[in-house]
Amino acid sequence: MSAELIAVYKDEQIIDLESAKVLGLSDGIKALKGTEPIYFDDSPLALEVIRHSCAHLLAQSLKALYPDAKFFVGPVVEEGFYYDFKTASKISEEDLPKIEAKMKEFAKLKLAITKEVLTREQALERFKGDELKHAVMSKISGDAFGVYQQGEFEDLCKGPHLPNTRFLNHFKLTKLAGAYLGGDESNEMLIRIYGIAFATKEGLKDYLFQIEEAKKRDHRKLGVELGLFSFDDEIGAGLPLWLPKGARLRKRIEDLLSKALLLRGYEPVKGPEILKSDVWKISGHYDNYKENMYFTTIDEQEYGIKPMNCVGHIKVYQSALHSYRDLPLRFYEYGVVHRHEKSGVLHGLLRVREFTQDDAHIFCSFEQIQSEVSAILDFTHKIMQAFDFSYEMELSTRPAKSIGDDKVWEKATSALKEALKEHRIDYKIDEGGGAFYGPKIDIKITDALKRKWQCGTIQVDMNLPERFKLAFTNERNHAEQPVMIHRAILGSFERFIAILSEHFGGNFPFFVAPTQIALIPINEEHHVFALKLKEALKKRDIFVEVLDKNDSLNKKVRLAEKQKIPMILVLGNEEVETEILSIRDREKQAQYKMPLKEFLSMVESKMQEVSF
């Protein structure tokens, strides 16, 4: 079955076998020229077809089990597929095995999946009395509506789909949730069931293993177990509390970045947390981003709590006159921002209402865009390398609605492409995916579980400099508008630390571990030596803890291991008398002895191994 053709890819579109027949191709799909064949396997294009058909298999099974069920949409998404529907029956996650069993029954029937195309009038008549399908049709322009059938079940859909349910053997329903119709909170709540599907048994097995591993590595779970952060309902949702260990981890990353930023010619700046609404009106945030902002009134004047740091940095730029000799100007700030996120999307540190960006804005001439972006790419590579992340870049180009001259856009986009080319970085292009004011590069990192995360962005901005009338004096002594480059590599410390926690499963590398060394005195008489060693390590900027509770040695060692501390030193008579230390090294997965002076020298060296 693995060699069977299920569709082709042509002009950035998947065309399935049934669609080829509907197109009137006498030889079916083989008559299509200039296409990439899609075979039944676990490749991304094949999985899109497989998962789309599995969504229909889910809907067919739901209809059989709950005859009053009505269906909205069932798309393929990054984590598999889902279907939104409603029924008078009460459904919980306990019902998923029953639904899954019914899906397997239909799959074994080897039902042919066929397609027909209806006019709008025909489609409205076909789904008469189905308000959810009518809602779907109201969002579709044109007069052609695809309808796929398998057995007695049919559904409005543009495809693509498999030719038969016999292909669907390796799937799993993963969770049940609620979802507002069309994502609008003013509409009724529907039921959403998620699932995953693969061509092969191995693909499903590997995925389910990753899901279980992801549960173990969930940063919310690790945050509690390792004492990194917490949330408190009395404070409010989406507002994290950084506990001492988490704050130590975060500060270490901040300090490493600050050192690197200063060496790279960035200047630290700091803007206020609240700014008059007048300035948000100039920037365009008031008209285009107001629903995501928080506002307050002071002395009858409206203020907006900043959702971004760019306006503050613009005002820093405007605080002095500038000539071409001053450029580029690189300002950075660990800026605390607030954004109104709906409670349903809040998720640990990954999605919060208050967060801190590793934000920087570069003011430069148009000719300096490429060199500045190139330097940012170099910086990005060093950071990702230090944290053992692989990453990819995506270049987003001019959208249909945008400002600025075509030549300016072409030049700016070309500068980004040349910078990527200079660093030999393979990148994807998101045509039309840029902001209305300039092209951008998105940084997407891949973690240990092969999940991709959107983190940093490099954004060329030709809009805000114009709105705020920014200028510098050029070589001809004329006023010229600078380009503004928005740049955040981590994205936010909260999000990055969440991803970092899951990437390492809490086993942070030595240079950022919230506790790097645990000292375990065997009994009271070894405590003085432990405190002396602790002070020596603290002077070397090492995060160290003495585990001196009245517990057994084994219990203290297990505690240190549970806390995922990279180095554990057990201190007894021999260590105190000889000053030769017994070290349990997590990274080396070894136990060894080392003289005290040599050990102190080693940890100093380890702290110097990583730089950005």
Curated annotation (Swiss-Prot):
- Superkingdom of the organism of origin: Bacteria
Which Pfam family name is an example for this entry? tRNA-synt_2b
Under PROSITE patterns, the record lists: AA_TRNA_LIGASE_II (PS50862)
Primary location: cytoplasm
User: What's its catalytic activity?
Assistant: tRNA(Thr) + L-threonine + ATP = L-threonyl-tRNA(Thr) + AMP + diphosphate + H(+)
Q: Which BP terms from GO are recorded?
A: threonyl-tRNA aminoacylation
List cystine links.
Answer: none
Q: Which cofactor does it need?
A: Zn(2+)
The record's annotation in CDD domains points to: ThrRS_anticodon, ThrRS_core
Keyword tags: Aminoacyl-tRNA synthetase, ATP-binding, Cytoplasm, Ligase, Metal-binding, Nucleotide-binding, Protein biosynthesis, RNA-binding, tRNA-binding, Zinc
Q: Which EC number(s) does UniProt give? A: 6.1.1.3
* Gene Ontology molecular function terms on file: ATP binding; metal ion binding; threonine-tRNA ligase activity; tRNA binding
The annotation note on the cofactor reads:
Binds 1 zinc ion per subunit.
Q: Where in the cell is it found?
A: Cytoplasm
Residues given in the record as Zn(2+) binding sites: 310, 361, 486
Q: What's a single GO CC term here? A: cytosol
Q: Where is this region: Catalytic?
A: 218-509
Task: Return the NCBIfam families for the record.
Answer: thrS (TIGR00418)
Q: What does the subunit section of this Swiss-Prot or TrEMBL entry state?
A: Homodimer.
The UniProt entry's sequence similarity note says: Belongs to the class-II aminoacyl-tRNA synthetase family.
Q: What does this protein do?
A: Catalyzes the attachment of threonine to tRNA(Thr) in a two-step reaction: L-threonine is first activated by ATP to form Thr-AMP and then transferred to the acceptor end of tRNA(Thr). Also edits incorrectly charged L-seryl-tRNA(Thr).
Name under which the protein is recorded = Threonine--tRNA ligase
Give the species: Helicobacter pylori (strain G27)
GN (gene name): thrS
